[in-house]
Amino acid sequence: SVKSRGLGDVYKRQYHDRFSGIARLYGNSGSDAIRRAHVAVIGIGGVGSWSAEALARTGVGEITLVDLDDICVSNTNRQIHALSQTVGQSKVNVMAERLHTINPECHLNAEDYFLTEKTLESVLDRPLTGVIDAIDAVRPKCLLLAECVKRGIPVVTCGAAGGRNDATLIRIEDLS
């Protein structure tokens, strides 16, 4: 006799088919941990857009995208979501739609605001596995990093040179 499979089984099979390479690389327990992960990407520009897409393509189960900016034609050379048809649209909304087509099972939160002292809590007051900081401005970057350290939330920081003009003049300093 043929058993009727529930929708959960169908999604599980689709997920397995889509991300079987991740299980081969990290094992089933690693793949399951990635599927349960919730990562926030703050700043959906040249670094954040590529980071968010990599998370979706890795099978991360929930992604929160935070940025208030719209896509500009000048973003085309460095931002994965910057296409002729997306110019003028919200970065987080366009990115969420794109990620949904890559990983339909991923829960996506598109938060249309900049990270500030007032909005920091709304981002970090959720169960996060990690944060990717792709913020250009130094002040909100420092706020985010300090709060992630305080809360014990793993954070990867990257992005532009804090709005500086010459990123080739690298100095190593404490951001505090």
Could you tell me what each predicted segment is?
Residues D9-A40:
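N-terminal charged helix/coil linker that caps or initiates catalytic domains
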Residues L128-S176:
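E1/E1-like adenylate-forming module used to activate ubiquitin-like modifiers
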